Amino acid sequence: MAHLGEFSLADGSVEHLQDEKGPMLYRVTSLAHDPQSRTLFYTSDNYAYRDVMAFDLDTGKERQLLKEARIGELVVNPADQSLWGVRHLNGIVTLVRIPPPYTEWNQIHSLPYGELLYDLDISPDGKLLSASFGQVDGNQSLRVFEIDALLAGEFESIRGFDFGAAVPEGFVFSPDGKYLYGSSFYTGVSNIFRYEIADGDIQAVSNAETGFFRPLPLGDDQLIVFEFTGDGFVPAKLDAQPLEDLSSITFLGQQLVEEHPQIKDWQVGSPAEVDLESKIKREGDYV
């Protein structure tokens, strides 16, 4: 049963908090935590019109904030406790802001048809918003915006990094607001990368064999990551130290071709080269 849970860093136990109605396939829900009010914000009915919900960590009570809002990718702005998210309707993606008491949403900016916006995060001081973008041609990028400029109607990023076809996933701010940590399949396997906001420098901080995902910065260059294993995703701690050299994974097909070059000639020919007349066995009326 899909549910919200609290994971203990001390012993690895998970406390069941709330069942999730209509979970997403891989991520269960879009989840945001407000430590000031000790509230979890999340989405339900994710394969319908998506409701925005709140769960009080002190009382254990759930309440519905917005019904059928079509809003996900939630994140809390620690400066004013507003919720930010992404709304999907008729192929149009819209960045929205939901101020307390979370009864209505305000449009910030709508992207052109076909462009995507996902994996939002807001800096600890509430001044910057980061997001991943997907273009119609398949190019993916990470961008950083000033929130004051967004509220003034200006949708121009101050920083960004183009990942090409390698999707940037789960990028989040470090506690000091200097870096963004996230994952990408840049080397053929999902590694964790650190993006420095001041100068736009990006560096790998992991060299995974099976893949690391969804980093959570703890401070002092410590991260919690999810490692992909045969038993599913397993939480692990990682020292986020920049690496100079990364090993690319070896694809079995590529290895076979290098060892046996004749495989390159094992290709199915074009149907246009087939002599169809020679294949006829009998002609007549079809009954």
Where are these regions (language model features)?
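Short loop/turn segments that connect beta-strands within beta-propeller blades
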Residues: S8-G12, D56-G60, P99-T103, I147-L151, ...
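A short beta-strand motif characteristic of beta-propeller blades
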Residues: S13-K21, G60-L66, E104-S110, E156-D162, ...
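Residue-level detector of Asp-centered blade-edge/turn motifs that repeat once per structural unit
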Residues: P35-Q36, P78-A79, P124-D125, P175-D176, ...
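C-terminal, active-site-flanking charged/polar segments
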Residues: N191, D199-E258
